[in-house]
Amino acid sequence: MASSEEVVAPSNEEEVTETPAAQKREERLRKFRELHFKRNEARKLNHQEVVEEDKRLKLPSNWEAKKARLEYELLVDQKKKECAERGEDYDRVKLLEISAEDAERWERKKKKRNPDPGFSGYAEAQLRQYQRLTKQIKPDMENYEKQKEECGEDFHPTSNSLIYGTHVPSKDSINRMVDDVEKQIEKRAKYSRRRAYNDDADIDYINERNAKFNKKAERFYGKYTAEIKQNLERGTAV
């Protein structure tokens, strides 16, 4: 009886063999949980990236450049207001902040980007006026952000959007447009007078149309024909 009631205690060897197995199982479970967590995180990040890419694709192709230009113009307007409050000239303050080389490089870049070829036709003159007027338009970033919040995802319309044609300009915008148009009319009235005739100028034309043609030809080819004209005047032309 005594031998049957004896409880057999586990040996130390069995404990030693079970403990590493449990540790390995726990290690595998821990790695599995880490992989599961990383997979969920990767899924979330991929979804966020897909959403952001879809938003970027819906934006205009030159949106980043426009945004940078608007931010720069907004910063320039703020500096101009600060200079006006201090009674300073913004152009002079700006020149004091940059070196002579940068100013010269900026001036060359400005002339290269917007050269003045002179009058070559009414269509070209009208196009240059349009470009000059559109560059003078100042963005209203406060109203822009307000409309962006109100419209949400429809702020950048697609083929399925119904937001087109629903915008109503404010009274301030209409007043600015009226003031700008009046300034254009006033400026146009000053330059619409017929130029006075110069009696001392050389007559190398037969009528007014031919005079305009000669001026245009001189503007484009004058530097190439200057030497020939001088030789003809001196009588040394071959």
Curated annotation (Swiss-Prot):
The biological processes this protein is annotated with in GO are: mRNA splicing, via spliceosome
Q: Where is this region: Disordered?
A: 1-25
Give the superkingdom in one word. Eukaryota
Looking up InterPro entries in the UniProt record yields:
mRNA_splic_SYF2
Of the GO CC terms on this record, one is:
post-mRNA release spliceosomal complex
Instruction: State its role.
Output: Involved in pre-mRNA splicing as component of the spliceosome.
- Similarity-based family: Belongs to the SYF2 family.
Task: Write the protein's name.
Answer: Pre-mRNA-splicing factor syf2
What does the subunit section of this Swiss-Prot or TrEMBL entry state? Identified in the spliceosome C complex.
Subcellular location(s): the record lists: Nucleus
* Species: Danio rerio (Zebrafish)
Report the principal subcellular site.
Answer: nucleus
Supply the alphabetized keyword list: Coiled coil, mRNA processing, mRNA splicing, Nucleus, Spliceosome
Q: Which residues form a coiled coil?
A: 64-85
